């Protein structure tokens, strides 16, 4: 049996290629949208991808299942859950597909894949137990757990309500998840766990960075599973302190259910003339993404630009600050373009119209005296203002962080929800001072606040260190 885990660091997502080396066939489990990467691996290993399967309708990225279906690969999707949780683009189509209920099995060469229904994260969620029958095994080696069991955590049951805006489903989903965990506890302790996400994903609150585990280890040391001693205890624990989901999650659920647009490959855009920048100035109908570093952006950028640097949060920021209808232009150098495009289409942002190289962008700003800046202060310099009431304090940390300590009078809007709640920012003529815990989230949020016409200052540095000192002085 061939096994390969493929990690996408910006979304902390794991996909899997599992192949039968005797027959040369392979399946891809939970593929992302850019499926060429899986073909490249399969070709190198002398395997042919004959199947692809999703554990569930994903909320955090566009699935590659339809891309595989377009290429004639047989795809497997859940048929659990009610009518709201069906793959509408697939059912009744001309694609080669099978719909799976609990206990459904299919073969990839001599490898058996068995679907097990584990609702809770979503109603239709399946996990896949993998048995290497060609190697003589009659019991599963491991299980691809999707967003059900992670290393150190379990899949959050609140997303249907907090992201997809369904009403009164959070607690029932948590209760259902508890029942699925009871089923999980009966699995052999030796079985390997191959999760759908790792540390950095918003699909849980305490995911580990170790890529694999075992059933036995997780039953002993997974904190969420340790709280599954009773339904009430588990429900209370799992619903407390979940991070606010990025704004694009609701769109991903819809697109993966109804059918994402078929790409057929990455849509690499051409270069845009700098003369177009004049049309983009202050134009919120267009999304100009400035991917430069923080200092360069704060010192000077086009009015209305969205700040989304090329770091691990690029997908999250872009997906939370840009709508799918907006045409996108990138301030970026050509060598970084392909990766940025891949990141954007992974979260359903397909309307990428062009790019402007950094040097040409900066020259145009200087030649046209068009650069605007955002004042940049640390907590020591901004402290008196933050405490004075003379400025509007916007705290873009998570609600759980805010509850542990915050500036009196501060407005808390987590940065991934800021676009949806931007009308709540009402400074009444005051400058908006934006802060988070260490400066990363507040930097991108300050740019968004400025994009909507407010005077803004960006506060950098370690909030907790400064805040604790202020409390000591006050005490």
Model segments located where?
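Short, well-ordered beta-to-alpha junction loops that form the rim of enzyme active sites
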Residues: 195-200, 205-206, 250-252, 291-293, ...
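Active-site metal-binding loops of divalent metal-dependent hydrolases
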Residues: 31-32, 57, 80-81, 121-122, ...
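Metallo-beta-lactamase
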Residues: 112, 122-244
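Active-site HxH/HxHxD metal-binding segment of metal-dependent hydrolases
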Residues: 12, 23-26, 33-117, 131-134, ...
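Rhodanese-like catalytic fold shared by cysteine-dependent sulfurtransferases
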Residues: 88-90, 156-158, 167-170, 217-251, ...
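Active-site flanking residues adjacent to catalytic metal/cofactor-binding acidic residues
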Residues: 29, 55, 146, 152, ...
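Histidine-centered catalytic micro-motifs
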Residues: 52-62, 117-125, 193-201, 434-438
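Core dinuclear metal-dependent hydrolase active-site scaffold
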Residues: 3-5, 16-17, 105-138, 142-143, ...
């Amino acid at each position: 049996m061939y096994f390969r885990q493929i990690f996408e660091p910006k979304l902390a997502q794991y996909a899997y290629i599992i192949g039968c080396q005797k027959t040369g066939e392979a399946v891809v489990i939970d593929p992302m949208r850019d499926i060429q990467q899986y073909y490249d691996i399969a070709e190198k290993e002398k395997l042919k991808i004959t199947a692809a399967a999703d554990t569930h309708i994903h909320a955090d990225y566009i699935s590659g299942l339809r891309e595989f279906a377009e290429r004639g690969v047989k795809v497997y999707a859940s048929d659990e859950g009610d009518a709201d949780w069906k793959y509408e683009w697939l059912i009744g189509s001309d694609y080669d597909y099978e719909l799976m209920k609990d206990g459904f099995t299919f073969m990839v060469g001599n490898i058996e894949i068995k679907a097990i229904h584990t609702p809770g994260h979503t109603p239709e969620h399946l996990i896949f137990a993998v048995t290497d029958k060609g190697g003589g095994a009659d019991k599963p080696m491991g299980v691809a757990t999707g967003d059900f069991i992670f290393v150190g955590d379990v899949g959050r049951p609140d997303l249907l309500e907090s992201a997809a805006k369904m009403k009164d489903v959070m607690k029932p989903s948590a209760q259902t998840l508890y029942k699925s965990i009871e089923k999980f506890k009966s699995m052999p302790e030796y079985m390997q766990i191959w999760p759908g996400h790792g540390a950095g994903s918003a699909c849980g609150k305490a995911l580990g960075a170790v890529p694999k585990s075992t059933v036995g280890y997780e039953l002993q040391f997974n904190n969420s599973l340790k709280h599954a001693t009773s339904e009430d205890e588990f429900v209370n624990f799992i619903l407390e302190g979940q991070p606010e989901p990025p704004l694009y999650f609701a769109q991903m659920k819809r697109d993966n259910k109804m059918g994402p647009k078929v790409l057929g490959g990455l849509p690499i855009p051409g270069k845009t003339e700098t003369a177009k920048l004049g049309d983009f100035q202050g134009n919120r109908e267009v999304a100009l993404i400035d991917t430069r570093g923080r200092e360069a952006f704060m010192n000077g950028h086009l009015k209305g630009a969205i700040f989304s640097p090329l770091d691990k949060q690029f997908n999250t920021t872009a997906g939370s600050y840009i709508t799918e209808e907006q045409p996108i232009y990138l301030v970026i150098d050509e060598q970084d373009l392909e990766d940025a495009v891949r990141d954007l289409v992974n979260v359903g942002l397909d309307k990428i119209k062009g790019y402007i190289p950094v040097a040409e962008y900066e020259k145009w700003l200087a030649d046209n005296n068009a650069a605007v800046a955002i004042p940049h202060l640390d907590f020591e310099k901004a402290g008196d203002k933050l405490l004075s009431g003379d400025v509007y304090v916007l705290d873009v940390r998570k609600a759980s962080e805010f509850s542990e300590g915050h500036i009196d009078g501060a407005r808390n809007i987590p940065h991934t929800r800021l676009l949806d709640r931007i009308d709540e920012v009402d400074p009444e003529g005051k400058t908006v001072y934006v802060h988070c815990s260490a400066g990363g989230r507040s930097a991108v949020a300050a740019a968004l606040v400025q994009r909507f016409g407010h005077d803004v200052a960006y506060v950098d540095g370690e909030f907790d260190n400064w805040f604790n000192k202020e409390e000591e002085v006050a005490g």
